[in-house]
């Protein structure tokens, strides 16, 4: 597969009073086109910091990002950061981040509205994605009228409607029960396979990580192991315990 995003020697340091915190230490890896990477690690290991940097929500202290063989030099300041996100990144969060005052279809339409697309095109795309995530009958409902799994499906449709090459998912099943979590992960797998959308997903759950094609293990701001996923949970748990600690 061709390289989509190359992360090279990425570091992030915070200064808090007299304390220096090294959130990321020389992190390097490649996300291929159509790739699906799960990132596992303990709280505070740098997983979410990495996603924030890849989404241009935070800037690295050092290191480089190369997207489609083009080094991204200016994406950490506005307005370049917003443009980068609009063109290349879709976000899925643990807490859904839907707007309560908008209907399901209005929430899904937001990225296209922000791009200034015409109403006809927006309505056509929203209809496609409502059907794809199984929420056509819920199009005029508001988020608070939906279950957690349904709300996450809305968030997934919103993230994908502008067809970004990369999805960044931060604990997307963290607020869901086991059955709903499995359904959401199956949906992400299908979208990764059918749309060839590359996914980088942070999780603490080995069952969730097993849906990815590859697992990176973080500890103390560093990648300590990199393992292809076979879909089995046991090897992931074994590697986690070996390199990170007991689950």
Regions found by a protein language model. Give the residues of each.
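ABC family nucleotide-binding domain
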Residues: 4-5, 10-223
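C-terminal end-of-chain micro-motif
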Residues: 1, 246-247
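Conserved beta-strand-loop-alpha-helix hinge in the C-terminal portion
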Residues: 222-246
